[in-house]
């Protein structure tokens, strides 16, 4: 599911027959859909006043080291794949975030956040989903990515709910 589809889901939950659902429930449903589609962004509360609550698209997960160690062949391979589409350098990497890690299979759903002056976001970052699944039987790691269409994040989505 793309971020736009996640937002459409949120809009449907809010405006079509879910009058008894709170805005928090709608956000939770949208975030579940975003995470299930390995989106690099979720909707997070960024401000709250006595009158309103603001949610914006923010990188998913918690700041955490990647399972691809710095300087390893795996991190080199990840950057090769990202650079087939985009031109981010290792020095552009702001942080890695762990969304999910499976202890049994070592599958990881990570979000790599890059400083990006061409990002449409106010914070000038672009987040990319990096999915890594070790394949010990053949001695490698399967990789998959969720990269913005033009490599740079669009303006962040913002929702403001009145109290």
Regions found by a protein language model. Give the residues of each.
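Bacterial N-terminal signal peptides that target proteins for export
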Residues: 1-7
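Short, linear, compositionally biased motifs with a strong N-terminal bias
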Residues: 12-13
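C-terminal motif of bacterial Sec signal peptides marking the signal peptidase cleavage site
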Residues: 16-17
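Cysteine-centric segments in proteins
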Residues: 21-163
């Amino acid at each position: 599911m793309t971020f736009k589809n996640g937002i459409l889901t949120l809009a449907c939950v809010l405006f079509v027959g879910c009058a008894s659902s709170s805005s928090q429930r709608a956000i939770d449903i949208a975030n579940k859909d975003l995470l299930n589609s390995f989106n690099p962004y979720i909707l997070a509360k960024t401000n709250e006043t006595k009158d309103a609550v603001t949610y914006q698209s923010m990188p998913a997960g918690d700041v955490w080291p990647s399972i691809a160690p710095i300087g390893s062949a795996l991190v080199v391979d990840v950057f090769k794949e990202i650079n087939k589409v985009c031109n981010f350098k290792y020095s552009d990497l702001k942080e890695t975030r762990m969304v999910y890690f499976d202890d049994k299979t070592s599958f990881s759903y990570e979000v790599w956040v890059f400083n990006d002056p061409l990002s449409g976001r106010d914070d000038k970052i672009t987040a990319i989903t990096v999915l890594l699944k070790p394949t010990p039987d053949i001695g490698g790691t399967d990789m998959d990515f969720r990269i913005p269409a033009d490599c740079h994040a669009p303006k962040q989505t913002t929702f403001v709910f009145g109290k």
